[in-house]
Regions:
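Hydrophobic anchor residue at the start of the ABC signature
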Residues: 8, 52
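A short, proline-enriched helix->beta-strand linker immediately N-terminal to the Walker B motif
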Residues: 13-17, 46
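Catalytic Walker B motif of ABC-type/P-loop ATPase nucleotide-binding domains
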Residues: 19-23
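Short coil-to-helix N-cap segments within the nucleotide-binding domains
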Residues: 27-28
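Conserved helical "switch/dimer-interface" subregion of ABC/ABC-like ATPase nucleotide-binding domains
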Residues: 35-43, 55
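Conserved catalytic loops of ABC-family nucleotide-binding domains
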Residues: 42-51, 59
Length: 105
């Protein structure tokens, strides 16, 4: 987790117009991930940010989510739209919610 936070801080120091975070939060727990994302929200405003993640919780707040399966775009939209559609993203979201609940027990 510490390594990822340092990498994010270094990227932010450069003040890029486009910020790309490629699974940058994969090795932190969901609570730490949420704290980091809340801290990043003000930084992401006003710039293009591309979040690449296997966790739905990481991309939930994104304006637009593009879902890939085996390298192909299978869905795109907001979190609410994708969950309502009941497709691949919705299935992944439900599985990850269940995993989080089981971890909390």
């Amino acid at each position: 987790g510490q390594k990822q936070r340092v990498a994010i801080a270094r990227a932010l120091l450069r003040d890029p117009r486009i910020l790309i975070l490629d699974d940058a939060l994969a090795s932190v727990d969901t609570l730490t991930e949420e704290r980091i994302l809340m801290g990043l929200l003000p930084v992401m405003r006003g710039r293009t940010t591309i979040l690449i993640s296997h966790r739905v919780s990481t991309v939930r707040q994104a304006d637009r989510i593009v879902v890939l399966d085996h390298g192909r775009i299978v869905e795109q939209g907001s979190h609410a739209e994708l969950v309502a559609n009941g497709g691949y993203y919705a299935d992944l979201y439900q599985k990850q919610l269940l995993e989080e609940e089981l971890e909390a027990i």
